[in-house]
């Protein structure tokens, strides 16, 4: 394919939005579903999406949103079966979703580790190999979802790490909460990584420009920040 043709081609977007609990990750996915023309599937891991939507504060149109809960005890098998089902629907030409959302990756990681640990010999504590299984599983899962030809939206909680400069000064950086060994790989596979922030008036925005203090990027367009409800514009 010629590059001149490729840059004009409309391609699905892969976006990771992260924030502290309660700031607006589920609302972000709800707005994606409400404002999209096609159907949205939310793979619910942390069980906060439905309660958030039931408040009916920001999102009001749920007609094109479907929710599938991922088992948060037998998570490895449940997640594997879900990906297999989506692939089969895609291969049969029956995948009728414009967007597939994962809410949220941080909890999915912990659930997988807890599941693997419960089946091990360390009294529920994950073994070193379990961490490696989880890391490969999550990265490969994102590649898998991207291969379905749909928009992929992932949420995560945020965490903060303190960095020290050679001169002794230090600064903190906020980034999506997941295993440090895969954060660059996961974020690298996304077109957009945005931090959900709230201003003094209570309006939610999506920060999509990297700073010294926040992990972010936008390879979809030239915006550095936008209102959450305007992300699809």
Please annotate each region the language model reported.
Residues 2-102, 106-107, 111:
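Conserved P-loop
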Residues 40, 152, 193-195:
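Short, well-ordered beta-strand core segments
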Residues 43-45, 155, 196:
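Generic beta-sheet signal
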Residues 95, 148, 188:
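Structured loop/turn residues at beta-strand edges in well-structured enzyme cores
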Residues 99-184:
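P-loop NTPase motor core
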Residues 144, 160-233:
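Conserved GTP-binding G-domain of TRAFAC-class P-loop NTPases and closely related GTPase folds
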């Amino acid at each position: 394919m010629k590059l001149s043709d490729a840059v004009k081609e409309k391609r699905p977007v892969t976006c990771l939005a992260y924030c502290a609990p309660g700031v607006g990750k589920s609302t972000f996915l709800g707005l994606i579903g409400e404002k999209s023309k096609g159907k949205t599937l939310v793979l619910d891991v942390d069980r906060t999406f439905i309660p958030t939507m039931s408040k009916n504060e920001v999102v009001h149109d749920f007609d094109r949103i479907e929710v599938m809960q991922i088992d948060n005890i037998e998570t490895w098998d449940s997640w594997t079966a879900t990906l297999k089902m989506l692939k089969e629907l895609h291969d049969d030409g029956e995948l009728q979703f414009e967007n597939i959302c994962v809410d949220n990756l941080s909890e999915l990681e912990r659930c997988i580790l807890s599941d693997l640990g419960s089946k091990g010999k360390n009294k529920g504590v994950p073994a070193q190999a379990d961490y490696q299984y989880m890391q490969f599983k999550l990265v490969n899962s994102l590649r898998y979802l991207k291969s379905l030809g749909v928009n992929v939206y992932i949420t995560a909680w945020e965490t903060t790490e303190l960095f020290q400069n050679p001169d002794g000064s230090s600064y903190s950086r906020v980034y999506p909460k997941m295993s440090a060994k895969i954060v660059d790989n996961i974020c690298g596979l996304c077109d957009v990584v945005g931090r959900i922030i709230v201003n003094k008036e209570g309006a939610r925005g999506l920060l999509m420009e990297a700073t010294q203090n926040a992990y972010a990027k936008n390879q979809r367009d030239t915006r550095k920040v936008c209102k959450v409800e305007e992300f699809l514009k």
